[in-house]
């Protein structure tokens, strides 16, 4: 129950092609991990560069899962030992930066982007030990994001949603009134587009599509 166990991660069984019972619905409560509740709820889990990270309101942590250890036998042969798909613990990487709006987290091939409502900033993070970069402060958009951010409702689309267009390397920060674009190639905010109030954008086969709520229903644009 996400309303009760807001700081707990539980592993399912491994999904197998052609299985009769969906293993993702079979949770093993003996294999669970509780994060520090003082850092807020877990809003988002991501898999980035072969590592799992958890976002809380006031922290970003790395989740240690199925960690491998290399040992050397008496014969000098190197052997890797794994812990059979178990959660090994976690490490808090940053405790003054976090994210409560899961829809604002966007993973690209270059970085992870997210909005910290508490600090009222947009961050770009490379997924390592180095702290995320506040790209709104760096690029002169601090006043704009503070005005554009609304009271966060993390389970709705009322606040910002972040999307990535892999054909142009553009990252879109979209809410009901704005669409601010950051380009990964030039590493700058480049423009405001008329994609505001767009609940879904997607790149397929190098073509960019968006779905919008109109008076007569949902429309698709290319």
Task: Enumerate the language-model features and the residues they cover.
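A short beta-strand motif characteristic of beta-propeller blades
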Residues: 28-35, 89-95
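A general structural signal for stabilizing positions within well-ordered secondary structure
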Residues: 36, 43-44
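Solvent-exposed, flexible loop/coil residues
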Residues: 28, 39, 193
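Homeobox/homeodomain signature
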Residues: 14-17, 25, 35, 50, ...
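Long, low-complexity, acidic Ser/Pro- and Gly-enriched intrinsically disordered regions
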Residues: 35-36, 68
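Beta-sheet-dominated scaffold domains
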Residues: 43, 49-51, 57-222
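Long, low-complexity, polar/charged, intrinsically disordered or flexibly structured peripheral segments
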Residues: 1-30
């Amino acid at each position: 129950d996400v309303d009760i166990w807001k700081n707990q991660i539980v592993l399912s069984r491994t999904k197998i092609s052609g299985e009769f019972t969906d293993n993702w619905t079979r949770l093993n409560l003996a294999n669970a991990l509780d994060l520090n509740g003082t850092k807020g709820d877990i809003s988002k889990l991501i898999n980035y560069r072969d590592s799992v990270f958890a976002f809380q309101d006031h922290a970003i942590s790395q989740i240690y899962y199925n960690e491998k250890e290399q040992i050397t036998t008496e014969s000098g042969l190197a052997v890797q030992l794994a812990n059979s798909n178990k959660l090994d613990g976690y490490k808090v990487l940053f405790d003054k930066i976090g994210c409560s709006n899961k829809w604002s987290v966007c993973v690209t091939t270059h970085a992870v982007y997210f909005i910290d409502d508490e600090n009222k900033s947009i961050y770009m993070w490379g997924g390592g030990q180095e702290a995320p970069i506040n790209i709104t402060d760096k690029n002169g958009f601090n006043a704009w994001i503070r005005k554009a951010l609304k009271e966060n409702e993390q389970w709705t689309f009322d606040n910002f949603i972040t999307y990535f267009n892999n054909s142009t390397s553009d990252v879109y920060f979209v809410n009901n009134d704005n669409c601010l674009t950051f380009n990964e190639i030039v590493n700058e905010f480049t423009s405001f587009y008329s994609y505001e109030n767009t609940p879904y954008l997607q790149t397929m086969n190098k073509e960019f599509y968006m779905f919008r709520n109109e008076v007569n229903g949902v429309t698709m644009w290319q």
